[in-house]
Amino acid sequence: MTHELFDSKGLLGSAPAAFVAGEYELDSSHGTLPVINPANGQLVAEVPSSSSSTVDRAVTAAVAAQREWGRRSHVARAAVLEAVRDAIAVHADELARIVSVEQGKPLSDARGETEGACAFFDFAISQKYRAVGSMMASEPGRSLGVREEPIGVVAAILPWNFPVAIFARKVAPALMAGNAVVLKPSELTPLSALALARLCRLAGVPDGLLSVVCGEGKDTGRALVTHPGVGMVTMTGSTRGGREILAQVADQIIPVSLELGGKAPFIVFEDADLDAAVEAAADARLWNTGQVCTCNEVTYVHADLHDEFVRRVVDRFASVTPLDPFAAGSRLGPLVAERERTRVQGMVDAAVAAGARVRTGGGRPDGEQYQSGAWFAPTVLTNVRPEMDIARREVFGPVLPIIPFDAEAEVVSAANSTAYGLTAYVYTRDLSRAMRMIDALEFGEVYVNQAGPEQVQGFHTGWKSSGLGGDDGPHGYEKYLRRKTVYVRHAV
């Protein structure tokens, strides 16, 4: 039976299909990808997996389309992106339904994600009057200039946690900079990208300039990032996946931008606003069911506040009821897939075996409605030690380990001991201490007395094993450009 998401008049059409060089690819001879609703475990669709020959057609078409697109003025490119942004706003409800079905987040959060996608397009559009470059006299009768140019074809690899927002985060600046994009969404959430590709075409994005190929990373992804026509790879995903991409493209020597995993410490000092810290710690852990690279992954609380903080956070977590993404008042959905639920359960079980104490949650919620689907109850763990696996590896689920500390130097050392370096949080009323922590923490983003999300004009970048390059703002936009130095002798 065809899922209700598929309609000849809708963004997905009557059947799921890759979007390649302006055409819809229905060929399933290379296999299919099952799309499962994580709330109930039911099959939503089977999406054709793209072969290496399909990837080749997409990149070849992108090379041709980029030549014309790159010659357009910034203002002309921005006009197309404005049409895409407006189309996303018009179709926000349909896009949100697709996200909720395939990814599992509450419908209200999915609607917020579409708003975030529009914001990414807004920032890219703002670059239409960008005036960056230089021309200067170098010697009498000679000048020297440095200017920006598009890279060419960008291969974009997307994760499953924000399939609409991160599509926009990659596509908008890449196109605005004059590039073409061939994009591979996660095999768990391909429908959002396919819907957006159709929407982009309707909004006037030229055929071939944007293609979406579907498949697993080891097949379709590898064929894409190693294609000789690709000039840059941008990827958001796991650290393991980032390492694989770096190895795959090493022979090509092309720019790579990676936004990878994180193990964000959330540090609460004795002088913190306790109400604000508790609320932010919970929100930063439970947003998107904990499936955010910037989520609060381990909370360090000063010993003077520890017991009261734990009591309040446990009450807060226990009050959150996981609900079907389409249910009224839903604020916490399932994990994205059963494999993720199993992985998170294994980490919690290992922590308990090592001495951690479950204060609330700990596994699948009670109730018949939770027996199908990838459900996991909001979980708080205490008696956690910094050397435990759950305090060092990314959980990516609604699990909050809490660790007490006594001294500033102690917590800095513990926070920095992870291999990751994406996001950190600090709660204190002491400005001098806050500035010391900003200096000491080895993370690309530091939030002081607030939680996320990040803003489009900032720079979302990780240190250490959390990535290379980054997204957003002028620094992220520049990743999609290369520079050419021009020497001119004009005196004869």
UniProtKB/Swiss-Prot annotation:
Significantly inhibited by EDTA. Activity is enhanced by Fe(2+), but is strongly inhibited by Mn(2+), Cu(2+), Zn(2+), Ni(2+) and Co(2+). PROSITE patterns: ALDEHYDE_DEHYDR_CYS (PS00070), ALDEHYDE_DEHYDR_GLU (PS00687). It catalyses: 3,6-anhydro-alpha-L-galactopyranose + NADP(+) + H2O = 3,6-anhydro-L-galactonate + NADPH + 2 H(+). It comes from the Bacteria. Optimum pH is 6.0. Optimum temperature is 50 degrees Celsius. Maintains above 50% of the maximum activity between 40 degrees Celsius and 70 degrees Celsius. Keywords: Carbohydrate metabolism, NADP, Oxidoreductase. InterPro entries: Ald_DH/histidinol_DH, Ald_DH_C, Ald_DH_CS_CYS, Ald_DH_CS_GLU, Ald_DH_N, Aldehyde_DH_dom, Aldehyde_DH_Superfamily. One of its GO terms (molecular function) is succinate-semialdehyde dehydrogenase (NAD+) activity. NADP(+) binds at residues 160-161, 184-187, 237-238, 260, 394. One of its GO terms (biological process) is gamma-aminobutyric acid catabolic process. It is an enzyme of class 1 (oxidoreductase). The AHG metabolic pathway may provide a useful platform for the efficient production of industrial chemicals and biofuels from red macroalgal biomass. Its EC number is 1.2.1.92. The active site is at 259 (proton acceptor), 293 (nucleophile). Gene3D superfamilies: Aldehyde Dehydrogenase, Chain A, domain 1, Aldehyde Dehydrogenase, Chain A, domain 2. Involved in the degradation of 3,6-anhydro-L-galactose, which is the major monomeric sugar of red macroalgae. Catalyzes the oxidation of 3,6-anhydro-L-galactose (AHG) to form 3,6-anhydrogalactonate (AHGA). Shows broad substrate specificity, with maximum activity toward AHG. The enzyme activities toward D-fructose, D-galactose and D-ribose are between 40% and 50% of the maximum, but those toward L-rhamnose, L-glyceraldehyde, D-glyceraldehyde, L-fucose and D-glucose are much lower. Belongs to the aldehyde dehydrogenase family. This is 3,6-anhydro-alpha-L-galactose dehydrogenase.
